[in-house]
Regions:
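Bacterial Sec-dependent N-terminal signal peptides
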Residues: 1-34
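N-terminal accessory beta-strand-rich subdomains and adjacent acidic, glycine-rich linkers
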Residues: 34-272
Length: 272
């Protein structure tokens, strides 16, 4: 009788444990939310996942050309935009307008895209745009209080060992990224597989990754103001390119070519 009682008690415990496991797994799945944004012509698609991390991927004509890649921004107060983020709401819109371009070969350009804005608690947003020829995103603060950005996570993860054409920074020592931040942004392009890129050298933008079947991914940025430009580095043993950012200058002295440059002697513990 005691043995049967023990077995029954054990089975009850197992049922409770199994129930808790099922509940925990269900909550984990439910905690992740996915949003899909398509380009106006429907050929490009990005799926944004909100969970423990904030990630996005890119499909072109139904084929994945960028695997789920995490993005985040770390503030000086320790807050991280993009990790365990609490979604507050979403909104979307379609934009189709002409933009004046006095310094281009045409006097105006068509600005045509679909946009998805994810609003999070703690006063920040992420805006995604899907154009017919590209996907873009940016972080936006809703707070009126000033803040410093300590770091930003940019981590391009590719589904295979693709071929990339990249411009390496020529200046500075191998493996010493800080010494490479001071450069002229001039070099020829080197073409190789992601796994064979030089991991000791920074790469500047734009750079191109060949996704095959006539599709090429050009990585670049625009609308940059009061923020460091993005460098990329090759991650060890993986089909990844990770972001590197120069820290904000604290002390500068005049020097360089014909004393025309400001040389950074000390930097702050933040990037912007």
């Amino acid at each position: 009788y005691d043995l049967i009682t023990t077995i029954i008690k054990t089975m009850k415990k197992l049922k409770i444990l199994l129930f808790l496991c099922v509940v925990a797994c269900t909550l984990t799945v439910q905690a992740q939310k996915q949003f899909t944004l398509n380009s106006p012509d429907g050929k490009l698609q990005t799926t944004i996942t909100v969970g423990d991390k904030l990630t996005y991927d890119i499909h072109c004509d139904g084929r994945q050309i960028l695997a789920p890649s995490p993005i985040s921004m770390t503030l000086e107060n320790g807050e991280v935009w993009g990790e365990k983020a609490k979604l507050a709401g979403t909104s979307g819109k379609k934009v189709d307008q002409m933009v004046p371009s006095p310094f281009y070969r045409a006097n105006e350009l068509r600005d045509y895209y679909n946009e998805l804005t994810l609003r999070f608690k703690k006063d920040w947003n992420v805006e995604f745009r899907a154009y017919n020829d590209g996907i873009a995103y940016r972080f936006v603060s809703r707070s009126k209080k000033p803040f410093n950005v300590v770091d930003e996570t940019v981590d391009y993860r590719f589904p295979s060992d693709m071929v990339a054409s990249v411009p390496y920074v020529k200046a500075g020592k191998d493996g010493d990224y800080e010494s490479q931040y001071f450069n002229s942004f001039e070099n020829t392009y080197t073409t190789d597989r992601l796994s064979k890129l030089n991991k000791k050298r920074l790469m500047f933008l734009p750079l191109v990754v060949d996704a095959g079947e006539g599709v090429k991914i050009c990585i670049t940025e625009s609308g940059l103001e009061n923020y460091p430009g993005l460098y990329l580095s090759a991650a060890e043993g993986e089909n990844r390119l990770t972001g590197q950012f120069a820290p904000y200058p604290k002390k500068t002295v005049q020097g360089g070519h014909n004393q025309l440059q400001m040389l950074v002697k000390e930097h702050e513990a933040y990037i912007a």
